[in-house]
Amino acid sequence: MKQHNNIGSSTTLVNWRRKILFYEFIFLEFLAIKIDFFYKLLMKWRKPVFLKEIKMAKVTAKDKVFFIGCGMLPSAPMLIAEETNATVVTIDNNKRAYLIGKEYVKRKNLSDKVIVEYGDGVNYPIQDFDVIFIAINVWPIDEVLRHLSKNMKPAARVMCKGLKDDITQFLKSGNLLNTFSVEVVSDNPRTQSFLLIKK
């Protein structure tokens, strides 16, 4: 029983951190879509991280790419499409973020390569995707990873953002290390990128 409580408290802590980041990113993305200075500032931090993740996941033009948690500034899905020429389907479960993000992609003339949909990572159909990205602000991460473990292609790659080894700890405590192998962990400013492969 004690171990179960540790799993629950660990998962709760991870999800609370992700919720806090969700609200932080809403504020930053709102500023970035309204004021070019903030967009440049945000992309100065984000772009090198996204480029590294694209390389880690070995994304090519042939891959079907799925991005969970695009927010109102879908900079990662847009960069993936621009850098690899892959088509990216991206979702957000916040209706307002989805609507603003969809309009932003349209304004940038990327609607043919970046498809923004309203959806939730805990139940979205993912079986056709080759590469799946999970943003740092996605929660409940435990339910999203369980959904992926049951429904993704066997050879799919998952690029998941986390904080201070929280994804590795969660995989251990949630008994998902039987399902996922952590292939690469990369340290970024404020975050980590985890490349997960299904065993």
Question: Model-predicted segments: where are they?
Answer:
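S-adenosyl-L-methionine
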Residues: M1-T60
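Conserved class I S-adenosyl-L-methionine
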Residues: K62-M72
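Conserved SAM-binding loop of SAM-dependent methyltransferases across substrates and taxa
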Residues: M72-T84
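Conserved SAM-binding motif I beta-strand of class I
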Residues: T87-D92
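Conserved SAM/SAH-binding beta-strand->alpha-helix loop
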Residues: N94-R96
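Conserved SAM-binding loop
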Residues: G101-K102
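Conserved beta-strand signature within the Rossmann-like core of class I S-adenosyl-L-methionine
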Residues: A155-I167
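Active-site capping/gating segments
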Residues: D165-K199
